[in-house]
Structures are given as structure tokens and as C-alpha cells.
Design a protein with these regions (language model features):
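Short alpha-helix
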Residues: 174
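Conserved class I S-adenosyl-L-methionine
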Residues: 1-30, 43-47, 67, 127-163
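Short N-terminal helix/helix-N-cap motif within the alpha/beta-hydrolase-1
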Residues: 63, 108-113, 138
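Class I SAM-dependent methyltransferase SAM/SAH-binding core
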Residues: 35-37, 41-88
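A short acidic, Gly/Pro-enriched loop at the edge of an enzyme's catalytic core
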Residues: 87-98
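A short SAM/SAH-binding and catalytic strip from SAM-dependent methyltransferases
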Residues: 98-111
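A short glycine-rich, Lys/Arg-flanked "PGG" loop and its adjoining helix->strand segment in the class I
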Residues: 112-124
Length: 174
């Protein structure tokens, strides 16, 4: 999709790569075993494979894995793709140096079970990097609400598209 393409070619790609690399063990790239859970369109595996890492990517749906493979293109040789449930991983214990996930936890039926699984497949001393967001914290926190309103003003003053304006919270909470 256009969003995937922008993200994979935008400035945030380098920022994400630096954040991730800063958490990796100090050993050769080929020796670091990385698992991306809920890979979606394959953002993390693609940027990591471009940087010379080998990555295992899992997702619950074949459609997302197919999208990730398309996005990876010739980088697929550095990425292993598996259809798998994030809450019931089919890997042995203590396999990965790093487990990463982005924008997945809030979609899971049983996040506690997922975290148990993710920790199970991590090697002792491994790193679990979970990036998730509370997109609607501004509805419950006055400080976040003020920040949200300031962001809306900034977007308007820069004449940018504001995708937050059409969110129907009442419908989502039903």
C-alpha cells in the first residue's frame, strides 16, 4: 500500500533502525536471532534485512505475510516467514536473542499469554522490544487532550491531511 511504501522509504525507517540496533546484543549481525511477531506488512524485517540482519517474521494471517513478502522483494532470502499465532508460538524455548513487536498487543485476545510465549522463546538475557500505542489516551487524560488539540492546530496551520478528525470513537467503543 501507499502507506507501507512511504514508511519503508521515509525518514522514520532510519530512526527505527537506530532504536532497534541500540538494543541488540554486541555480536555479529549473522549471529543475532531476531523474531518479529505480528509482522503485518513486514516493516521491521525489511529494514533489518536491508541492514544485514536475518529475521524470522510471524503473522496470524497469510494475507499479511504475502504483503510482507511483496514489500521485502529480494530481501526475502534474509527473512523467514511463518503463519503463526502470537499467543501460541511454535518455536522451541530460548531460541531468539531479540523479540520485537509493533502495533500488535492491543489487538490480542490474551496479551498476558502472548507475553509469556514471547519470553519463553527468548534466550536468557534476550531483549523483548514491544512498541504499542494508546491512540485514544487523549480522551481520558487532560494533558494528552491539550497536546492532541495543539497537534490538530499545527496540522491545520501546515495545511496537512489530518486523519484523526474522522475517528468515530462512539462507534469504536460499541
Amino acid at each position: 500500500s501507499e502507506i507501507n511504501h512511504k514508511e519503508l522509504n521515509g525518514m522514520q525507517k532510519g530512526a527505527w533502525l537506530e532504536v532497534l540496533k541500540g538494543q541488540f546484543p554486541e555480536k555479529a549481525k549473522d549471529e543475532i536471532k531476531i523474531l518479529d511477531i505480528g509482522t503485518g506488512p513486514g516493516f521491521f524485517p525489511v529494514i533489518l534485512a536491508e541492514a544485514g540482519y536475518k529475521v524470522t517474521a510471524v503473522d496470524y494471517t497469510q494475507e499479511m505475510l504475502d504483503t510482507a513478502k511483496r514489500n521485502a522483494g529480494n530481501l526475502c532470502e534474509r527473512i523467514s516467514f511463518y503463519k503463526m499465532d502470537a499467543q501460541n508460538l511454535e518455536f522451541e524455548d530460548d531460541v531468539f536473542d531479540v523479540v520485537i513487536s509493533r502495533n500488535l498487543t492491543w489487538n490480542l485476545k490474551d496479551p498476558k499469554r502472548a507475553y509469556e510465549e514471547w519470553c519463553r522463546v527468548l534466550k536468557p538475557g534476550g531483549k523483548l522490544l514491544n512498541f504499542d500505542a494508546n491512540w485514544y489516551g487523549y480522551l481520558y487524560d487532560e494533558e494528552k487532550r491539550l497536546s492532541y488539540e495543539e497537534d490538530r492546530k499545527s496540522v491545520e496551520s501546515e495545511h496537512l491531511d489530518d486523519h484523526y478528525l474522522c475517528t468515530d470513537i462512539d462507534r469504536m467503543e460499541k
